[in-house]
Amino acid sequence: MGTVSETSKEQFVKKNKLAICAILRDLQKNDTAVMVTHARGQFISRILDIQPETNQFIFDFGSVENENVLALGAEQLTIIVEPTGAKIEFTCNKLKHVEYLSLPAFSSAIPEQLYFIQRREYFRVSIPQWPAYYCSGKFPDGTQYKYTLADISLGGMGLYAMKGSEFPLQGCSVLRDAAVDLCGFGLFKLDLQFIRALDKQVVNNKGETLTVQRLSFKFLRLSPIQEKGLQRAIFELEKQQTAKARKFQEGL
């Protein structure tokens, strides 16, 4: 997940310690997944406790031991969170290994500043076209559909349809209980609101250039469980693509 540009985010900075602690407490209370990134890796964590009296906050170890070792060796880390309708971003200096409720955890100073960005759009990750991921279900008139996923975010997603294919929806029409299959990353049943259709050229697995329609949808609502599942899936997809790109570059 990319960070917000330096030129645009300064208007969203918060420097009041009480406000920063309140935001961190909300993340803790809602058990919101946070992404921790540094020069040598990234992992998903949860904020466990905020301790303003000692100017510390505690967050959980990652699920992979080597990721935790790399994090402890990092001089600076960035924490990015994307709760519904917002993006939160701040940096931490060197972490400490502590015990919290008899389990290993990280401790860091409460950040001196934090960016709280109200967003209409979320970080969007492109979906690999081979193997394809699909969204399927029924139109309001009862006919079935199955489209290839183009990209996805916590705010919505794009689908590819062959140009000229029948699409019985108008602006603001809703698809109920659409099955979004992210393969090993989960199957989600979601309500989708249609936004627009645009022509786009794509290259298929045979190397052929095709003109398709990109159908844009937004999610009408996400339950906390759906949001957490999608956030994890998006993170893993982005991580997978980064690893493929790095492997390709190393092979040049």
From Swiss-Prot:
Location of the protein in the cell: Bacterial flagellum basal body
The family this protein is said to belong to: Belongs to the YcgR family.
HAMAP family: YcgR
Species this chain originates from: Yersinia pseudotuberculosis serotype I (strain IP32953)
UniProt KW Nucleotide-binding keyword: yes
Annotated Gene3D superfamilies: Electron Transport, Fmn-binding Protein, Chain A (2.30.110.10), predicted glycosyltransferase like domains (2.40.10.220)
GO MF term set: cyclic-di-GMP binding
Subunit and partners: Monomer. Interacts with the flagellar basal bodies.
GO cellular component: bacterial-type flagellum basal body
Chain's role: Acts as a flagellar brake, regulating swimming and swarming in a bis-(3'-5') cyclic diguanylic acid (c-di-GMP)-dependent manner. Binds 1 c-di-GMP dimer per subunit. Increasing levels of c-di-GMP lead to decreased motility.
Keyword field: Bacterial flagellum, c-di-GMP, Nucleotide-binding
All residue ranges annotated as the PilZ domain in the record: 118-236
Full protein name: Flagellar brake protein YcgR
Keyword Nucleotide-binding in record: yes
